[in-house]
Amino acid sequence: MPEGPEIRRAADNLEAAIKGKPLTDVWFAFPQLKSYQSRLIGQHVTHVETRGKALLTHFSNDLTLYSHNQLYGVWRVVETGEEPQTTRVLRVKLQTADKTILLYSASDIEMLTPEQLTTHPFLQRVGPDVLDPKLTPEVAKERLLSPRFRNRQFAGLLLDQAFLAGLGNYLRVEILWQVGLTGNHKAKDLNAAQLDALAHALLDIPRLSYATRGQVDENKYHGALFRFKVFHRDGEPCERCGGIIEKTTLSSRPFYWCPGCQH
């Protein structure tokens, strides 16, 4: 499943294609959404927001399309009039004069009013988004030490969208490697330096992934280009200590770590 950085990049692509342009055609596969098609013609997308792995497409008439790709959903941007060759099932089409965005295969799709946005079950449940620039390491530390989360092992906590939205398995693995901790630790057992390091890594690693993953110009990022240090690298030497990276299972997901420098 894509994690927060991948969802945010998808949102950026959708915004770049149709933001601010009048919609010339709108189509929804689900019967309960059909009545919104005519209401959106002539409106435009004001912005595309991410809440962890959910995507909110906001329209100029104050309606918001909620979608969660889960395992199989995918957005595509095409030239208007182009029909991609795919076996996927089309769920949503938002068309402008020159670009069209298409959502395939997703099943979790709703249209929300401003009032419904504030009461939607998933949106109520998720924590702050790690890519939200307003989220600070201080707030991340407060959440780590809160009664709700301080006794949770990191193996499960860093996959829980109620803690911080947008984290997933590769980010969990890379964050814990960055701070030299294993997944069985709890926030209540860390010292001040460890807490500070973890609070920063919880935000820095996802933001670096969003900004630079897939880029090839290392000079632009002064060597800070995001790349996996342990994820999918079992059997290889750890670049920090030379130990051999191992793979196990934690919270029902593959977990990669270095026993030489993660304790």
Curated annotation (Swiss-Prot):
This is Endonuclease 8. Involved in base excision repair of DNA damaged by oxidation or by mutagenic agents. Acts as a DNA glycosylase that recognizes and removes damaged bases. Has a preference for oxidized pyrimidines, such as thymine glycol, 5,6-dihydrouracil and 5,6-dihydrothymine. Has AP (apurinic/apyrimidinic) lyase activity and introduces nicks in the DNA strand. Cleaves the DNA backbone by beta-delta elimination to generate a single-strand break at the site of the removed base with both 3'- and 5'-phosphates. Disulfide bonds: none annotated. Pfam families: Fapy_DNA_glyco (PF01149), H2TH (PF06831), zf-FPG_IleRS (PF06827). The active site is at 2 (schiff-base intermediate with dna), 3 (proton donor), 53 (proton donor), 253 (proton donor). Its EC number is 3.2.2.-, 4.2.99.18. Belongs to the FPG family. Gene3D superfamilies: 1.10.8.50, MutM-like, N-terminal (3.20.190.10). It comes from Escherichia coli (strain SMS-3-5 / SECEC). It comes from the Bacteria. A zinc finger (FPG-type) spans 229-263. GO terms for molecular function: class I DNA-(apurinic or apyrimidinic site) endonuclease activity; damaged DNA binding; oxidized pyrimidine nucleobase lesion DNA N-glycosylase activity; zinc ion binding. One of its GO terms (biological process) is base-excision repair.
